[in-house]
């Protein structure tokens, strides 16, 4: 067997993070599990005792969404969620749009979670009631200060409070079931038949509004860089645990909190009051305390997620680079943190701490994120599926159905919630204008380049899909060296060689064995490899006038050198431009001729192959 065959079959080991299924469940539940504390009250204001009907309607779509988000997690191990999947599946500008959607979602999550946390805390400390608004603003500012100081939550700490809150929620379900008894449970289901008439407009509005009960699902995709291998198995097990927890708690707690309690009960304290009603004040206080702590954690998680989105969009070239600057004192991105905190504070003040108003504003960003993620994943599946067996067709059809159901919910909210449309749409337009303006500003100075995502286990598919028609051998493969002067010499030679044709620029990053990923950080190695960003920017700046078709491929430094050979085999070029020092990264091949040019002390090779083929073993020995 030839050396080339051995290399091509070599298994590439991918180092994962440290989060197993339980810790991933905990972080996701710390976000999505907080919805039960305020969603029943929000739905009750519009739909009264019918609220549980609409939660059940959206529960089916939620389960389908969990399948999609688990796949996004293992397909995109660098994380980034909607920003990453949409930029790679659609276009980098779609990533900007997804970033604005998720920022709207994060802003409202931070505001409504902090506010609800203070409301539940007032159950055990009634003296806080007049100070809820002030306390909420103070808690958001304090969270901002803690993040600037570099004091962040860990997954293990989150797991403690997520488990405590989950135990409290399940305890309320069990206590209420015991309190009602079998006959009472059956009778409670009939309570949903009382209330406003279920006309078509009411059904449509309820379906769109109830998606708020499952906000926070998107956080699983942000955990991918920290997730333990095998990510595919861990992501599905974590999402399975999330589904099980939500199926047990969300519909039943919504049903009983909206049908069993007195009409005079504060809707924003439903779950705590239900626990006290079924099992005594001790359980009610436990739910209030554990819920308020988890809500504050969810608010902090939203702030962390938001400022990491700001940093990712900055590194992609869509926002001013000042947002990425870190202070010398604590090495934290203080400007990005400020950008993540100020608007939730403004929202709390402007709405005067009204949970219902904040809930109405929620739908735009949340459902917009779901829609863009679903469409992107459907396109990725469509491109990668080669054999359309009945099982594959059924699976793909279910994915498309999920997308359609989410689009319908988003359209409903755009129509029936004009305030959310104005608020979310306004922020989205501002974000797009800022992003495109920044991109244009840097275009002639330090242009942003979006390379092909290189995935070791699906290298051929990912590169072939991204390059499309450029896979013709008429194009030149250019391997950029790390040294700047040598890189400029290679770019100059490549621009002349590929003039009027096309070029694929390849850069292999530097290995950082001890690189640390923060929780919810976008772990794309290219965005953190400033040398690669500069190399591609120079290549774009120097070659775009001469080379009409340009593509860029980035190979992370933690992958073996053989991955460069994998790219070469996929691109199948007839000409390769490389320095003499980097020639060893190429696979053994039959070379027709080599031209050598020396520019400013750098020897640049032009290697020509009339037919791409491996050298026999005897020739490589």
Residue ranges and their predicted role:
Residues 1-39, 63, 67, 75-79, ...:
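Membrane-interface "cap" regions at the ends of multi-pass membrane proteins
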Residues 91, 238-300, 323-352:
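TM-loop-TM module centered on a large, flexible mid-protein loop between adjacent transmembrane helices
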Residues 164-191, 254-261, 373-387, 414, ...:
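Hydrophobic alpha-helical segments and their helix-loop junctions in multi-pass secondary transporters
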Residues 40-88, 92-101, 108-139, 243-247:
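Extracellular loop-to-transmembrane helix junctions
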Residues 157, 322-335, 370-418, 451-454:
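C-terminal membrane-solvent junction of multi-pass transporters and transport-like membrane proteins
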Residues 10-11, 159-216, 222, 228, ...:
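Helix-loop-helix junctions that connect adjacent transmembrane segments
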Residues 472-526, 604-609:
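Small/aliphatic-rich secondary-structure junction motif
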Residues 132-182, 238-242, 359-372, 394-406, ...:
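Membrane-interface loop-to-helix entry segments
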